[in-house]
Amino acid sequence: MTIAFELSVFALITISFLLVIGVPVVLASPDGWSSSKNIVFSGASLWIGLVFLVGILNSLIS
């Protein structure tokens, strides 16, 4: 169970880093938002899911 928690925290940190770097780049590019809107929303949905997963796993571990 601890391994799953650690991997989900690592995935959350990785997705957070990618969103922090990627979203401003997408918004700054001239045609970026209209062509990459689905990717940004998918990343945000994945991030929200990982936040809930980390919270659930944390409550099971401690």
UniProtKB/Swiss-Prot annotation:
Major place of residence: plastid
SUPFAM superfamilies membership: PsbZ-like (SSF161055)
An individual GO BP term: photosystem II stabilization
Keyword set includes Transmembrane helix: yes
Subcellular location: Plastid, Chloroplast thylakoid membrane
Cellular component aspect of the GO annotation: chloroplast thylakoid membrane; photosystem II reaction center
Disulphide connectivity of cysteines: none
UniProt keyword Thylakoid, yes or no: yes
Keywords noted in UniProt: Chloroplast, Membrane, Photosynthesis, Photosystem II, Plastid, Reaction center, Thylakoid, Transmembrane, Transmembrane helix
Topological category with respect to the lipid bilayer: Multi-pass membrane protein
Domain of life of the organism encoding this protein: Eukaryota
Transmembrane segments annotated in the record for this chain: 8-28, 41-61
Family, as annotated: Belongs to the PsbZ family.
Description of how the protein assembles with itself and partners: PSII is composed of 1 copy each of membrane proteins PsbA, PsbB, PsbC, PsbD, PsbE, PsbF, PsbH, PsbI, PsbJ, PsbK, PsbL, PsbM, PsbT, PsbY, PsbZ, Psb30/Ycf12, at least 3 peripheral proteins of the oxygen-evolving complex and a large number of cofactors. It forms dimeric complexes.
Record function comment: May control the interaction of photosystem II (PSII) cores with the light-harvesting antenna, regulates electron flow through the 2 photosystem reaction centers. PSII is a light-driven water plastoquinone oxidoreductase, using light energy to abstract electrons from H(2)O, generating a proton gradient subsequently used for ATP formation.
Name the UniProt record assigns to this protein: Photosystem II reaction center protein Z
